[in-house]
Amino acid sequence: MYRTAAKRLLAGGGITTTRLLRLPKLRSTIIPSSYTSGLCTSSIGGNTESPMGNQSVNPNQSGPTASSSTGTGEGQRRHESRKPRAEFQEEQARVLSASLRHVPRLGWTEEAMMAGSRDVGVSPSIVGSFSRKEAALVEFFMDECLQLLMDRIDSGLDLQNLIPSERIFKLIRIRLEMQVPYMSKWPQALSIQAHPLNVPTSFKQRAMLVDEIWHAVGDGASDLDWYVKRTILGGVYSTTEIYMLTDDSLEHRDTWAFLDDRVKDAFDLKKSIQEAKYFAEDIGAGVGKSVQGLMNGVMQTMSRRSGGSAF
Amino acid sequence: MALRSVSRRLGSRILNQRSFVASLHSHATSFGFQEVKEEEKSKLVGNVFTNVASSYDIMNDVMSGGLHRLWKERLVGKLSPFAGMKHLDVAGGTGDVAFRIYDAVYSVKRRALQKVDEASLEETQIYVCDINPNMLNVGKQRAAERGLRDNKSLVWVEGDAEALSFDDNSMDGYTIAFGIRNVTHIEKALAEAYRVLKRGGRFLCLELSHVEIPVFKNLYDLYSFQVIPNLGELIAGDRESYQYLVESVRRFPPQERFASMIADAGFEKVEYENLVGGVVAIHSAIKL
């Protein structure tokens, strides 16, 4: 998060230099990475930095609009009739978007992306420049689905009349239904996301998804910790996603039944954890009001017991 | 007052242009550390490569300790060749990069893993362009040794990087390995590269570049100026050519400057990667 903010700042600051006007984009993408001779022990830190700069579609957009206008100014100095420059991020997004059509047939592969690039009218060579190629396609899809979900929520999904567990059910169902057209190739997407190089980004995307769902559900009357909430929802989402892979029922009825059960389990879990907490607090109230008091109480109890058994 | 500010702006712009042009022309009139006339530079470079052609590959191996193979592998890896691509390798005389691209496209393992259309395989064209016919002959010989003499995918063309004989928007990929240093006008070569590439086509340049790391830089300079010309004398019998080589590396623009030149030619997403601490750099860009 701090990295993308810093890049945005750099891009904004670089616009004012008159000599090398296209460098703002350069600064965010030129990452000179050093390799030791022959061994190619590439620093993974260095590698993951450039994908972050390219993959996240939003942060760089403050740069391009400004640089394209100054770019045309410089273009006039030298060559009048230069057509407007397409920003690489936009081009990548267009190619990936067109590639999604080919995924059910060709899978989440370079072939699908090359077919997509041909549809857009760009040489398939461009696929060679996407970082972590297939992962770029999967991550693009995940981002798109999240955006679609957010749009659906904003355009007035009827959540007010539902209790939290039903809201969660509805949101997860909407999100999973977006994957239905690609269900035959979804296992491949999951394995791509699980690849060590891709885990940071896929984890981040799932975290954002879960965050968004909780945000839409509203916090409700829950005492659970922020992380625990998201972890549990992440678990419910992932298990349902995997269940869906092998579900042949009509309109995935079995999946929704499974999802319903899991959401209820999660809320029951919440209730039972809450009960355990009240119980613990009652014990704590006996020896002191705070959790620290409970700890001390436990320690005291334990030390008392061990002292007793020594005799 | 307005006039003064206008003239100051004009003056600074002219000054910028002049210094810009001057720094470019310094490459055009430099033959290593010597100053030569522009018209003469290409002739002098031509002589160098005519002399070294036959021992070019051996000298590469000796000077880089075999590392140049890894660098070229990395270059082709970055390119990600695909079946049916039209690729241009400029200044690729002896065919190192071209053969690697050929192998990458035609490798049986790759074909098995991906569903490659046989028809598109046939359409693959790899053009090897070099200004020096001697270097091309060595390349053709090596092709014959590999059994690729009559292969239609490999096309050997004699031509000038500053004035290519290919159509606009005809190439999916353009590579130049250890060649752009020898071109008289770098910006012309870059402009030609931009011209022949299709939209979405990639430009990749592998070149000896500048080392900034303190102690390593000194070692590298020592190696370049003391060891390499002697190796040249010993193995190729030509000290001057290798003296030119190490000097021309120093006169070539550093990584950032070259990257900005590439961006000025119109390319997008200009990036570079240093190998061996900057001894070699791979610059990549896309035409959009």
Swiss-Prot record, chain B:
Stored SUPFAM superfamilies: S-adenosyl-L-methionine-dependent methyltransferases (SSF53335)
Coiled-coil stretches noted in the UniProt entry, renumbered to this chain: none
Chemical reaction(s) catalysed: a 2-methoxy-6-(all-trans-polyprenyl)benzene-1,4-diol + S-adenosyl-L-methionine = a 5-methoxy-2-methyl-3-(all-trans-polyprenyl)benzene-1,4-diol + S-adenosyl-L-homocysteine + H(+)
Disulfide feature: none
Enzyme Commission code(s) on record: 2.1.1.201
Keyword flag Transferase: yes
Gene Ontology biological process terms, A to Z: methylation
Cross-referenced Gene3D superfamilies: Vaccinia Virus protein VP39
GO molecular function, a single term: 2-methoxy-6-polyprenyl-1,4-benzoquinol methyltransferase activity
Membrane topology reported for the UniProt record: Peripheral membrane protein
UniProt-listed PROSITE patterns: SAM_MT_UBIE, UBIE_1, UBIE_2
Taxonomic superkingdom: Eukaryota
Enzyme class: transferase
Family matches, as Pfam families: Ubie_methyltran
Quaternary structure note: Component of a multi-subunit COQ enzyme complex.
UniProt similarity note: Belongs to the class I-like SAM-binding methyltransferase superfamily. MenG/UbiE family.
NCBIfam families named among the record's database cross-references: MenG_MenH_UbiE, PRK00216.1-3
Name used for this protein in its record: 2-methoxy-6-polyprenyl-1,4-benzoquinol methylase, mitochondrial
